Design a protein with these regions (language model features):
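A positional/architectural concept
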Residues: 1-61
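Charge/polar-rich, low-complexity and marginally structured segments
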Residues: 64-190
Length: 190
């Protein structure tokens, strides 16, 4: 398969598979041994991390430009589908979900979101599944946010709205009418 030339520009948003969306801030040369190596310097603002990727390793690393809005819409649409079969034990499925998240591929992220989303506000989801779901959703939302010029939290909410994912139930919220009717005082016996 012929190698495709990836052309990146300073200021461009890019996706590094294991980190998500970052901004290419500059290119620089570093001397390693007796060789000069040209590097792409990528800043991941949210995680406060800077990554340097050697130019000759860009393709192998999986670094890519942002996906198109059309491909992102296709990924989100695929997340609306029916959850995949759960024939494997959880440990293997979790490892597969982790691999999909770290791929940085919007379609694979959508698979994780689709398979692990809650179907109703009262569904209970194990902590490890919820954590994987949140990571996949955040990675999708990072790219969605840049494509649609919004912040990541708003993008997460928008994706969940599109997918029809029920909002979390606030167990601390009390209906004002109920609050007035309830008497929690210790009356010392009735």
């Amino acid at each position: 398969m012929p190698s495709k030339k990836l052309d990146f520009k300073t200021g461009q948003y890019v996706v590094y598979p294991t980190q998500g969306v970052g901004k290419l801030v500059r290119t620089e040369e570093q001397v390693v041994g007796d060789q000069k190596i040209k590097m792409l310097v990528i800043d991941f603002e949210k995680s406060r991390m800077t990554l340097r990727v050697p130019m000759e390793r860009v393709e192998i690393s999986g670094l890519r430009p942002l996906t198109s809005a059309r491909k992102m819409d296709e990924a989100i649409a695929s997340a609306k589908g029916k959850a995949g079969a759960k024939r494997m034990i959880w440990a293997r499925r979790a490892a597969q979900y982790e691999e999909n998240i770290n791929s940085g591929d919007p379609m694979k992220l959508a698979e994780v979101v689709r398979d692990l989303q809650r179907r109703s506000p009262t569904d209970t989801v194990p902590f490890s599944a919820r954590r994987l779901y949140m990571r996949a959703l955040e990675r999708m939302a990072q790219e969605f946010a840049v494509l649609h010029k919004m912040d990541v939290d708003a993008a997460s909410e928008k994706i969940e709205d599109i997918l029809g994912i029920p909002k979390e139930i606030d167990l601390n919220a009390v209906d004002e009418d109920e609050e007035e009717e309830e008497d929690y005082s210790d009356s010392g016996g009735e």
